[in-house]
Amino acid sequence: STLDRSSAASDVYKRQYAYSAVYYPHGVSTNLDGSSIVIPSSSIALRTFAYNDQVAFPWFAPAGFQRGVVTNASSVGYVDSASGEFKAVSLNEGQRDSLYSNKINPIANFPARGVNVFGQKTLNANTSALDRVNVARLVVYIRERLDDIVKPFLFEPNDAAVRADAKAIVDRFLANLVTQRGLFDFVTVCDTSNNTAERIDRNELHIDIAIQPVKSIEFIYIPIRVQNTLGQVG
């Protein structure tokens, strides 16, 4: 039916953009011959991802003054459609907030701090931790590593001993992510509760995982209370 097709299309959209992010604006960089060129915001973001992974881990937010430093653009702005010239843009706090509320990660030039990526929202349509880049990259990392970690269990006997070994190796991997500040906690299940007789007969091994990812600080509140001279501060 039309409703079914619409629902299916919506599901595809959510899956397609759950791990996507948008950045604004573009930037000016230097070409190999020394000339100035305009580079897309995606190029700036990817360079920032690479820098983040050099100094931290993929599950740290590639944004802010610590890991969001832009090293491949001297200024940010847009190309004017009428003149074809690059127009520098200095996003103020209100403009940055407006962009961020619409899931657009601002790239801004800060006085005495230079150009920095100042947001890390994804286009995830659902309300979940996957609406942040650091969590999305964490999940991608976990999926890729687990794919390698469990491969040695292919064609092994699907019995209690192998299931215990599989759970143990996954637990060690996830425990390491807790140490490396990627996860707060996790739970894994690999026993007869999720490896039923039917699944075993289909030659399948199931390892169910639930994770609590570490989230980044994006808002800081410091309330200050002023006391009179005779008042007690407490």
List the model feature ranges, each with a label:
Residues 1, 7-234:
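Structured, hydrophobic secondary-structure cores that serve as assembly/anchoring elements
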